[in-house]
Amino acid sequence: MSNGDAWVIERFGDEGSAIGLAVEAKLHEEQSEFQKIEIYQSRSYGKVMLIDGCFMLSERDHFIYHEMITHPALFSHPAPRRVAIIGGGDCGTLTEVLKHRGVEQAWQIEIDERVTRVSEQYFPELCGSNGDPRAQLLFADGIAWMRERPADSLDVIIIDSTDPVGPAAGLFHPDFYRDCHRALGAQGVLVQQSESPL
């Protein structure tokens, strides 16, 4: 891949569009229990992560996604003390949540522990808050976790998932949203990633 002609391309199904980055090297590839995880060194976006062939983040611009999925929701709530992140295995959203001093508990419920471990290795700047005493990293099914939550036990829910395929498909089902609604307090806020705009 050092010849400058290598590209990683994500194609958007039958829509006739794609996005690609020139890459210098493949740094990591594995098939976890749930999905294929790849890390590349790109020419212009630093390291990039792909899951099942879809771009998840890059060193250069991940902050746009992580800040925007987090801060508007937390600033919209008058006192966001209890925050749940469903997904978010790269830990960037958790890091942004914990910038809010009023947050007392932040749960990150990620089904695939390998996403977090790979992120700790290749994107350590995103994982700096993993040891914060307010953070609880749980490697479990977020759908089942939400089903078990008592009523009025959360202030903010952030659904930081992949697109609605594979293990994330259930995160787009009405039953999951009923469970979220029950778990949120009266002024609760829910925000979610809702697929690529392309």
Where are these predicted regions, by residue range?
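N-terminal auxiliary segments of SAM/dcSAM-dependent transferases
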Residues: 1-48
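The AdoMet/dcAdoMet-binding core of the Class I SAM-like
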Residues: 2-8, 57-192, 198
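Short small-residue beta-strand/loop micro-motif enriched in glycine and branched aliphatics
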Residues: 48-50, 192
